[in-house]
Amino acid sequence: FNMESDSFEDFWKGEDLSNYSYSSTLPPFLLDAAPCEPESLEINKYFVVIIYALVFLLSLLGNSLVMLVILYSRVGRSVTDVYLLNLALADLLFALTLPIWAASKVNGWIFGTFLCKVVSLLKEVNFYSGILLLACISVDRYLAIVHATRTLTQKRYLVKFICLSIWGLSLLLALPVLLFRRTVYSSNVSPACYEDMGNNTANWRMLLRILPQSFGFIVPLLIMLFCYGFTLRTLFKAHMGQKHRAMRVIFAVVLIFLLCWLPYNLVLLADTLMRTQVIQETCERRNHIDRALDATEILGILHSCLNPLIYAFIGQKFRHGLLKILAIHGLISKDSLPKDSRPSFVGSSSGHTSTTL
């Protein structure tokens, strides 16, 4: 998931790029950029800034509330609660980088190489960890509902190990960003936070595009489809009081995941094929790809503020947990608390079959 602060592809007018001799004034790793006249994107830039700001605020509020409720619910905290706590942290940390990326959309990258590396690393780590945690949640729901038994992941030390492993793997996958990203300066182009890999940029870019699409989308998607597919089949066969509600939540999980990430990954694949000259690059195609990347990237960013809605606000237990916190601090009357309010807002994964997320 590469959120590039500026587009370098278009500098001069032209249609067929096959015979073009690229300007030597550009950095070596930008020589694969298409010499096209960029379309006016000033309105789009400010529109993106507004979207980033809204997502930042919603994600900050939503994920903070999720973390607050889970941390308060020490008694009866389930495996899924632990995953959701880490997921909320990942989305929250990702959201904290949005103001910097928003500023770079307007002014270019003015924050220097050190912050370029740090912010890019933080963004990538939390992107990978968020997606991998979603897959872990689907596995936990699969084990709890389909097998309806106490799983090995119920052991606290193992759950902590899984979460630490996810963060470690995410850091490992994000290391190329830390190594190769720097502030890029070029004539007539705003400075940007971009990968500098020397003369092998095209080959490295292909590898760095395959990694996030594989580990950040395809593999988690296959895991989610497998787990939720069998979970739905079990719910169809079973006669559970909350079956229909659980089905709506599961459908929402898969649907929102697809809506947010499938368009971006498809466009990213087309962009990779064009940059590596598998598909011939023209100015018209480049402009179409750039616009599509900007639009679908916003969908991916929106996912960070939708997670609290999908995994928490739909469930009654989250609302009960939040009401408990408000009652403890005297903000509401304890009489207004539901009688069946429980500490865990996603359901336990041990001893019984939970049908809510």
Curated annotation (Swiss-Prot):
It comes from Pan troglodytes (Chimpanzee). Glycans are attached at residue 19. Gene3D superfamilies: Rhodopsin 7-helix transmembrane proteins. One of its GO terms (biological process) is calcium-mediated signaling. GO terms for molecular function: C-C chemokine binding; C-C chemokine receptor activity; C-X-C chemokine receptor activity; interleukin-8 binding. The lineage of its organism: Eukaryota, Metazoa, Chordata, Craniata, Vertebrata. Residues 73-81, 140-160, 229-248, 313-357 are cytoplasmic. Pfam families: 7tm_1. GO terms for cellular component: external side of plasma membrane. Receptor for interleukin-8 which is a powerful neutrophil chemotactic factor. Binding of IL-8 to the receptor causes activation of neutrophils. This response is mediated via a G-protein that activates a phosphatidylinositol-calcium second messenger system. Binds to IL-8 with high affinity. Also binds with high affinity to CXCL3, GRO/MGSA and NAP-2. Keywords: Cell membrane, Chemotaxis, Disulfide bond, G-protein coupled receptor, Glycoprotein, Membrane, Phosphoprotein, Receptor, Transducer, Transmembrane, Transmembrane helix. The keyword Phosphoprotein applies. PANTHER family: C-X-C CHEMOKINE RECEPTOR TYPE 2, CELL ADHESION MOLECULE. Disulfide bonds join 116-193. The chain crosses the membrane at residues 46-72, 82-102, 118-139, 161-180, 206-228, 249-270, 292-312. This is C-X-C chemokine receptor type 2.
